[in-house]
Amino acid sequence: MRIEMKNISKAFNGNPVLKNAQFMIETGEVHALMGENGAGKSTLMKILTGVYKRDGGTITIDGQERTFKNAKEAEEYGIAFIHQELNILPNLTVAENMFLGKELMYGKTGILRTRQMNAIAQQQLAELGLHVKGAMLAGELSVGQQQIIEIAKALMTNASVIIMDEPTAALTDREIETLFTVINKLRKEGVSFVYISHRMEEIFSICDAITILRDGEYVGKRSIPETSFDEVVSMMVGRSIGERYPERNSQIGDVIFEMRNGTKKGKFENVSFQVRKGEILGVAGLMGAGRTDIMKAIFGYEPLDSGQIFINGQEVKIDSPIDAIRQRIAFITEDRKSEGLVLDFSIRENLALPNLESLSKGSVLSNELEQQFTADMMKLLNVKASSGEQAVKSLSGGNQQKVVIAKWLGIHPQLLILDEPTRGVDVGAKKEIYSIMNKLTEEGDAVIMVSSELPEVLGMSDRVLVIHEGKVGGILEKDEASQESIMALATGGE
């Protein structure tokens, strides 16, 4: 299937989000759609699949002009959209998820052909390299396995084009390899993929071509062999952003935080490490190794069962997030939408949440202080929004992440914990987040950064703490750290 979108325009409430956008994909092609958050990538694909009606432009499929009334019609025609938030019902079986809305029945009796559906589901998944039983509950599978189920569902509707939005955001390295194997198998069979992602290494590994949007407009198309990381970044942001990771200039000082023999039953045991003033400590390890559990313990979200925590040399008890905040410890969680933000609240309301005491006069929240704090933080972090009253759910991923960071900067943290700080964030916003981390450490504060992106860990960390199966695999100085040395420790080697 060959799709061509020309001069596509779309506005919401008079605000243009797409202006003469273009996109073209060939049969059997894996085509990346890139741009900063808010560039219009998802909107363009929603227009293709009938979720939104375009204001102008044309869509041709195999030479014939087409318009879909809704996503179901697009799916029936062979175009499937797998969203970042997977459409899997955890309490249904694998087969029930795959046959949802198209169940096999005995005539008109309403009785399901459960055994037949289970067998077909197992066979379809086995062809994609996933060997699970159709009768298993989908909620028992990993996110990577659920993603393969989504692809299998699309293929059951005879999809010729599969759109994937941030497909690897929550996958382990092994699951990413499995996904790429499936994509490579299907592209040989003529299936095309639109691959929306910010992960440059993956795009250069799996894709054939890249189309770039900026501020809702078509910037250009490049074939992978003919372009470079720097050119793509420059096209996305409209300027050269210089070095990928900003230079570190902070002075490393005394120990600000220490954990000794920290243990949480079933999660991690005997974890000991230090963080110093002015330092960024990177934390690496495989998914499920216990990295996030350790951070939750530091923040008092899931307190230690045993072990000690010291702040500036003094032992402290952290049994709740309130205890952590009193010690000026801030935690920016990996799941900003469900744990970091109240999506229906405005930017102002989200920023106020951990800062109610400092924004109050007496015991009454001061509107004046709140408004000033919101304006200051939006300016400091370059949050792109119409005003502080805009609902955070309407912001791009990068701007949502900036709001999460901004609300915690209000407590003037001496230790800032960032868990996957740039997941789902575009290149320009990543650079701004890195600059915030550097600014904090230059002022003598400390940062712990948990990341699954090894180039990010290597580019930003002064030292790297590697966690393996709930234990400290090792701690690497900057000059010792490499992708190979980190992975060796993360997998139990030396």
Swiss-Prot record:
- EC annotation from Swiss-Prot or TrEMBL: 7.5.2.7
**What InterPro entries does its record include?**
AAA+_ATPase, ABC_carbohydrate_import_ATPase, ABC_transporter-like_ATP-bd, ABC_transporter-like_CS, P-loop_NTPase
Which parts of the sequence belong to the ABC transporter domain? 3-240, 250-494
Q: Matching PROSITE patterns, A to Z?
A: ABC_TRANSPORTER_1, ABC_TRANSPORTER_2, RBSA
Keywords in UniProt for this one? ATP-binding, Cell membrane, Membrane, Nucleotide-binding, Repeat, Sugar transport, Translocase, Transport
Q: According to its record, what are the GO cellular component terms?
A: plasma membrane
PANTHER family to which the protein is assigned, alphabetical: CARBOHYDRATE TRANSPORT ATP-BINDING PROTEIN MG119-RELATED (PTHR43790), D-ALLOSE IMPORT ATP-BINDING PROTEIN ALSA-RELATED (PTHR43790:SF3)
Q: What is this protein called?
A: Ribose import ATP-binding protein RbsA
- Taxon lineage: Bacteria, Bacillati, Bacillota, Bacilli, Bacillales
